[in-house]
Regions:
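Short, glycine- and small/hydrophobic-rich beta-strand elements in well-ordered beta-sheets
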Residues: 27-39, 68-98
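Acidic/histidine-rich, surface-exposed loop or edge segments in extracytoplasmic proteins
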Residues: 37-50
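Bacterial N-terminal signal peptides
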Residues: 8-25
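An amphipathic, aromatic/His-enriched active-site/gating alpha helix that lines ligand/cofactor pockets
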Residues: 64-80, 94-95, 101-155
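Extracytoplasmic/secreted envelope proteins and their assembly/folding machinery
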Residues: 41, 53, 57-60, 64, ...
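A mature extracytoplasmic/lumenal domain signature
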Residues: 48-50, 60-62, 88, 100-106
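Positively charged n-region of N-terminal signal peptides that target proteins for export
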Residues: 1-4
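Sec-dependent signal peptide cleavage junction
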Residues: 21-32, 152
Length: 155
């Protein structure tokens, strides 16, 4: 009996803090996850819903605007090395592939599309609208490749 009461007391000690805050507080305390790269070059590919390519391109335009207005010194470097191309032909399922090519990678810079937009767009309703547009356009992330430059044939 003494052992059971000890176990119950221990559980109560751990559970009370978990229930003492609202869910909003728990989510608000979590910092958004950064997307960083360690290689010299990064390539990311996303399949976009065919009827939402204009929405995706609006999000990319907002990303460019956010980085260009940012006071962070690495933002200008990110702009200089971040290119986005659109595949000319659709995938068999109709989705359109967008490839992000980042060269050179700015070490420790955040390459999260939404984090960078949120740094510029402070209104929660507008943030939600941009996120919904981004999420609605995205069929799936295909891959991320990063690594060192092995050969630069232009030199």
């Amino acid at each position: 009996m003494r052992r059971l009461s000890g176990v119950l007391l221990a559980c109560a000690v751990f559970l009370i803090p978990a229930f003492s805050h609202g869910h909003g507080d728990l989510f608000a305390q979590q910092a958004p996850q950064k997307t960083t790269f360690t290689g010299d070059v990064a390539v990311m590919a996303y399949a976009i819903n065919p009827d939402k390519t204009a929405d995706y391109e609006k999000v990319i335009a907002q990303l460019k605007d956010a980085l260009s207005k940012s006071e962070a010194p690495e933002a200008k470097q990110q702009l200089a090395g971040w290119k986005v191309i659109k595949n000319a032909t659709p995938n068999p399922d109709g989705s359109i592939v967008y490839i992000h090519i980042i060269s050179p990678v700015v070490k420790e810079a955040d390459y999260s599309i939404m984090n960078n937009i949120y740094n510029a767009v402070k209104d929660p309703a507008e943030q939600k609208a941009v996120f919904d547009m981004y999420r609605g356009a995205m069929k799936q992330a295909l891959f991320v490749i990063q690594g060192p430059m092995v050969a630069d044939l232009s030199k």
